[in-house]
UniProtKB/Swiss-Prot annotation:
Organism: Arabidopsis thaliana (Mouse-ear cress)
Expression sites (tissue/organ): Expressed in flower buds, developing anthers, pollen grains, siliques, rosette leaves and roots. Detected at lower levels in open flowers, stems and cauline leaves. Expressed in young seedling in the hydathodes, shoot apical meristem, root tips and lateral root primordia.
Subcellular location: Nucleus
Recorded consequence of changing D101A: Loss of interaction with SKP1A
Protein name per Swiss-Prot or TrEMBL: Probable F-box protein At3g61730
Keywords: Nucleus
Quaternary state and interactors: Interacts with SKP1A.
Function (record text): Regulates tapetum degeneration and pollen maturation during anther development.
Ranges annotated as spanning the membrane: none
Biased composition (Basic and acidic residues): 1-14, 37-48
Amino acid sequence: MKTRSSDAEGDSRGKMIAPVGEGNGGRKRKLVQSNEQKNDIQREEDGRAKRRIVQSSDQKNGKILRGIRGCVSPRCSAQTYQSRFSWYEQDIWTYISRFLDGKSLVKLGATNKWFYKIAMEDTVWRFACLRDLQVPVPFPVSSTWIKIYASAFDGSHSYLFRQKEKHIDWMRIGAFVLDSRTSLLTESLSGRLKFPREGTIERMLQSSGSCLINDIKSGIWIADLQLVRCPVCDLSTCDGTMQTLDARHIELFLSEGYKDGSWDYNLIGSHKLQKNASAACGAIFDLKHLKESSYSGILNLKSWTGESNDSQPKAVIAPHAVAVHTRLQENEGILVKYHTMKAGTDGDIVSIRISQQLL
């Protein structure tokens, strides 16, 4: 009779008993791990689904949620510090230069080559010249406007080139325009202008104290009032003086004929008044604009000659006329002379002088 233990041993020989660690316990751990992975996947899917639901609901409500991102601001560079405004805008500086006087334009041109190009523009100097001379309309010229400006505002006058030793003082009157090629010269400003009859200049002066001259160069003219010593004698003791209304074309000082002395003044007429003269007067009128110049205030002596006891020389300028007036002390009379200068033998008249000298 076999015991149960032997039966058990026999049974144990026919069957393999699985280890404790690799049996049911191992399968349980695998099942747990697979279940955890499934749960993790499910949670991720549920999270994505919830995020999609939140995003869709936010989009419906008009909200846009953005996450945290890195800074994408541009890094500072040399170009970042450069201003977009350019100091070298030609149109801007051309406009600015219209408000500068001659000295300021020269200083601007001395800054650098770029500003020199701007400052040397002929249109800039034309504007400056017309502005400072207060002449509204430009005329065709043969010289550059920068040279014209310099000759008009550098302090030059006709007695710097001729009879320099006779000159005492001068005063700039201004600029006016002669465009009709015919002018009326007169020594009388009291009452209405006396229009001279036809004839020689001497006859016109004797009859009316005025004369007409033709072939005047059209354009801008500059007028000065000159005070010079007695032109008759060379005595150092003579204290006689002569007043001269000196008018010239704006380009006269730039002409070679004037600078080399080949152009000179010629006496075209004179008028002697052998009685006490209350004032020394002289005027130049453009014949085409005579009527409007007469009513511009020139013939209204009280408006510009000062008080009756004022003996200082006075002058007035109009767009197409110029006049001078100086009150005189008691005298024996006055000698008025008319000079003109031509641009060559048969050229146009480029300068006019009306001078008064006490007898």
